[in-house]
């Protein structure tokens, strides 16, 4: 079923796309995907897989090594991780705070010492460590990061307050890898031919 959906989104009469589909590199991506995903754990993840493979055939925006990383991310991260990614992407280059993400997800207020708060901090830690998101930083004309001006605390102000899981001070944005992941996994190519899932093979990826 997934393969049929991919083909329905590609112009297989385009010489470059046809050549790409037959290439060893693309066939290797297919084998990796089918080997590691005998059955997607959710419909959303199956859709991400389909989008990645379709976009990898139609676009040369990124290398196959990066596409392989995207496939690994689908295995590594939960659907809640991807919801956080989608919210951060929606806010663009200005970034959004953890509190803003929590609000956009429609979550109710919870205590700082709750399991939900710990999980939320873990999501950001995972995505930051994985190179998907980073704290928002200004860049200069040449695309270089501008160093942050250190903020000095007044003497006698006591210990630095603990940062809330739902902090509204620091903003987060997607890295370039994160932006490309959204382009490949969360962007659905329009159908080139009509596809009826009730006809033909019913086999899931």
PLM feature spans:
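Charged, alpha-helical interface segments at or near domain boundaries
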Residues: 1-77
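Hydrophobic/aromatic-lined pockets within catalytic cores
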Residues: 11, 89, 93, 128, ...
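Intrinsically disordered or highly flexible coil/loop and linker segments, enriched in small
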Residues: 43, 62, 94, 133-136, ...
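Amphipathic alpha-helical interaction segments
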Residues: 48-51, 83, 122
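Short amphipathic alpha-helical interface segments
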Residues: 60-113
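Active-site-adjacent structural elements in folded domains
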Residues: 68-71, 138, 155-162
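Short amphipathic alpha-helical interaction segments
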Residues: 79-80, 111-157, 167-169
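Short, amphipathic alpha-helical interaction segments positioned at domain boundaries
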Residues: 146-205
